[in-house]
Amino acid sequence: LSLKPLLQEKGLERSRVVRMADLNETFGYQIFTGARHPSRNKVLQIAFAMALTLKEANRALTAARVSVLNCKDRRDAIIIFCIDRGCSLQKVNEELYRFGEETVS
């Protein structure tokens, strides 16, 4: 999973993204260096921390070899809605919880 180009493109620091994604510092570092393969939820946590677009988030999910967001899936539809509106990780988790769906983190 190569997120370095996106970090540079968006002018973000890896340490800040890891913190905003609510990831363990070591695990987050290992994801960014490619030493660890993140779960779908971890990729989504990073996507929200980096404020990725839907296209960028799906590209990251594909690179991580997990399923892309599917608007026909209720949970994914809520996540897509939140991505489109630039919501924070906290906000998407609140929305998922409100609808009785599994949170991202």
Predicted regions: what they are:
Residues 7, 18, 47:
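The alpha-helix within a helix-turn-helix
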Residues 35-48:
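Short, basic-rich loop-to-helix N-cap that marks the start of a DNA-contacting helix
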Residues 15, 19-21:
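Short, contiguous, well-structured surface segments enriched in hydrophobic/aromatic residues
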Residues 21-38, 63-65:
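Recognition helix of helix-turn-helix/homeodomain-like DNA-binding domains
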Residues 15, 26, 55:
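Key DNA-contact positions within bacterial/archaeal DNA-binding proteins
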Residues 1-14, 90-105:
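A short, Lys/Arg-rich alpha-helix, primarily the initiator
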Residues 58-87:
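Short, charged recognition helix plus adjacent turn
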